[in-house]
Amino acid sequence: MSADGLVSAAASAEEQAFEAGLRPRTLTEFVGQRKVREQLSIMLEGAQARGRPPDHVLLSGPPGLGKTSLAMIIAEELAVPLRMTSGPAIERAGDLVAILTALSPGEVLFLDEIHRIARPAEELLYAAMEDFRVDVILGKGPGATAIPLDVAPFTLVGATTRSGLLTGPLRDRFGFTAHLDFYAPDELARVLTRSAGLLGVSLTEDGAAEVAGRSRGTPRIANRLLRRVRDYAEVRADGVVTRDVARAALRIYDVDGLGLDRLDRAVLEALVGRFGGGPVGLTTLAVSVGEEPETVEDVAEPFLLRAGLLIRTSRGRIATPAAFEHLGLEPVADPLGRSQAPLFSNTGLLAEGGLLPEDGLHPGGG
């Protein structure tokens, strides 16, 4: 399944419109991220007591965990307007000047994908965040003149899925930073129960648990699966989403008990069935499943790594014992006759998400 598939954390424009009706409006309604909610609540209450805008907020974490919802909640809790834009939409410094000078006092500016903002615009943002001022340059060369323009006090909420790409000067200007983590199954079940109530879906407790367990720790995926399961319940069942109904529905959509889709399983089956569990190079593995290496690396591998089904080593990709177990197979011995378990424990592993100079490491591999 492609990056925009059923268990992808990315959201289409149509889905974003649908999500608007499910978003929580207050920190109390927001499920999960307990520490982040508590920290935000204290900061917002303190700012309101002082009668000043709160510090600028940076929210990081994988897509689909609620960064946009929290930005909306911040504005709602402060009872101020919210203006939304994104890093890719700001191509020139002038684009940002137009936005900043139009802000009303206390307004919240939400800048999604802030790591993708153009460098000239980012540099202009520094003074706006610190001094509520922007310097507009008129002319070029030695005769250029800087005209300072005041900006109404505001709160910037930046969101990023790749905080490592933020420059130090930009990151340092945020007074509050928080990282959103993946959700536990019980938290996702609460998200699903709330969404089912808003959508008018009859969802049993075990049905919610079943969908939650296949949602990859991501509320956006959970809500997407709920919509598909609802369709199945209405068309082929009695309209009630039970555990059995959820299982039958998600079987049709090729989402298994761990939340793996067609591509995920194809990668695992190739790694285990064709290459004996590895190690095997990325290019060889991608060719074996008929996908581009970038697709395997960016779409399938992140969740397989997080689920403990695949690891990256200096010799290539290797299937873990859990991968064999998930496929209903026994771990095989490596060419030296050892079991897979010592191989995993003795291999020097890079941190999850690291890139390795491996390829052509399996016999016959590319």
Curated annotation (Swiss-Prot):
Q: Which Gene3D superfamilies match?
A: 1.10.8.60, P-loop containing nucleotide triphosphate hydrolases, Winged helix-like DNA-binding domain superfamily/Winged helix DNA-binding domain
Coarse class of the primary localization is cytoplasm
Per the record, the GO terms for biological process are: DNA recombination; DNA repair
Q: Which GO terms describe its molecular function?
A: ATP binding; ATP hydrolysis activity; four-way junction DNA binding; four-way junction helicase activity
For region Large ATPase domain (RuvB-L), the annotated ranges are 3-183
Q: Which keywords appear in this protein's UniProt record, sorted alphabetically?
A: ATP-binding, Cytoplasm, DNA damage, DNA recombination, DNA repair, DNA-binding, Hydrolase, Nucleotide-binding
- Region named Head domain (RuvB-H): 257-366
Where does the record place it? Cytoplasm
Record field: transmembrane: none
Q: Give the enzyme class.
A: hydrolase
The UniProt record gives the binding positions of Mg(2+) as 68
In this chain, ATP is annotated as bound at 22-23, 64, 67-69, 130-132, 173, 183, 220
Cite the InterPro entries for this sequence: AAA+_ATPase, AAA_lid_4, DNA_helicase_Holl-junc_RuvB, P-loop_NTPase, RuvB-like_N, RuvB_C, WH-like_DNA-bd_sf, WH_DNA-bd_sf
Report the SMART domains cross-referenced here: AAA
Q: How does it assemble?
A: Homohexamer. Forms an RuvA(8)-RuvB(12)-Holliday junction (HJ) complex. HJ DNA is sandwiched between 2 RuvA tetramers; dsDNA enters through RuvA and exits via RuvB. An RuvB hexamer assembles on each DNA strand where it exits the tetramer. Each RuvB hexamer is contacted by two RuvA subunits (via domain III) on 2 adjacent RuvB subunits; this complex drives branch migration. In the full resolvosome a probable DNA-RuvA(4)-RuvB(12)-RuvC(2) complex forms which resolves the HJ.
Q: Does the keyword DNA damage apply?
A: yes
Q: What is this protein called?
A: Holliday junction branch migration complex subunit RuvB
Q: What is its EC number?
A: 3.6.4.-
Job description of the protein? The RuvA-RuvB-RuvC complex processes Holliday junction (HJ) DNA during genetic recombination and DNA repair, while the RuvA-RuvB complex plays an important role in the rescue of blocked DNA replication forks via replication fork reversal (RFR). RuvA specifically binds to HJ cruciform DNA, conferring on it an open structure. The RuvB hexamer acts as an ATP-dependent pump, pulling dsDNA into and through the RuvAB complex. RuvB forms 2 homohexamers on either side of HJ DNA bound by 1 or 2 RuvA tetramers; 4 subunits per hexamer contact DNA at a time.
Q: Which transformation does this protein catalyse, written as a reaction?
A: ATP + H2O = ADP + phosphate + H(+)
- Any domain commentary? Has 3 domains, the large (RuvB-L) and small ATPase (RuvB-S) domains and the C-terminal head (RuvB-H) domain. The head domain binds DNA, while the ATPase domains jointly bind ATP, ADP or are empty depending on the state of the subunit in the translocation cycle. During a single DNA translocation step the structure of each domain remains the same, but their relative positions change.
- What's one GO-annotated cellular component? Holliday junction resolvase complex
